[in-house]
Amino acid sequence: MKNRIFLVVFSLVLVCNLWSCHTDPLLQPVPKNTDISFVQPANWPTPNYNFQNNTLTPDGFALGRRLFYDTRLSIDNTISCASCHEQTTAFAQIDHPTSHGVRNQLGNRNSPALFNLAWHTSFFWDGGVNHIENQPIAPIMNPVEMDETLPNVIAKLNADPTYRQQFKNAFGTEEINTQRLQKAIVQFMGAIVSNQSKYDQVKNGKASFTADEQAGYVLFQQKCNTCHAEPLFTDFSFRNNGMPITLDSGRAHITGLASDRFKFKVPSLRNLNFTKPYMHNGSIASIGAVLDHYTSGIVQSPTLDPSLQNQITLSATDKSKLIAFLNTLNDYEFVKDVRFKQP
């Protein structure tokens, strides 16, 4: 009898150990006591997306995080959202100037950084998507990026019982559909907020600029904030910033308007240290080279932004001080935040 009891107990222990060895690492929950609430930072504008119809919960956030890092969202199971949006680069991509998709394809635009998305009114360089919940679908179906269909993605997820359980935890039932997929990913991406840079600390009265940083800040306010408005450091507009003319028509690809040719969305200047290379096509490798473009490299065209018609006057000293200020916009805590790392 004792031997039979021992065998039963041993079998249970063995089964448990085998199960733990094969538990999907992506099922690791968000660490306990982790704050995933969405809070509007002091002195920031009201966000465009406030989770009113997509309540942010630990289960929804964990599901969205898993989906964000899951390569099964692509046709050949090789590319995830994180393949082009890595946390260490402020959710941009550093190893390719343009997006890298399935079958080693390269897109024609730089992967934009993903942070503070809840304040955005449109998405992608051309503003082709105007609601954050529709944003995750576009790269899934893009033939150069993930080249997958939504029915196939849903089928893959449904075939995984651990996903069915996570959808139940997040939404009440095991049903997996496109709307729930969208909402889960947005619970993760929408909660990615970067507001712990030195600039933010200065604005909150917890730090002070150096003399060069302060001088650079004054220059920024004089030369740059027309397009890169504080505190998000973008006004979300579309502008032609004088880059060399290519076949990419930018915003005009969406609107069909000749007046929008070669206009692209103004990016945020936060976290520039992590998000290089720069510009819509990833063609400029350094901040210094970006400033050189604005002082001496502007290409004239009919839709060039009026503020750049005469280029921007900056001395070498001005550039140095401006870069010192721009470096205060880097959020070193954000790129290490355990809430956003790959599970």
Regions picked out by a protein language model, each given a short descriptive name:
Residues 6, 21-343:
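Periplasmic c-type cytochrome electron-transfer domains
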Residues 1-8:
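Bacterial N-terminal signal peptides that target proteins for export
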Residues 9-17:
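Bacterial N-terminal signal peptides
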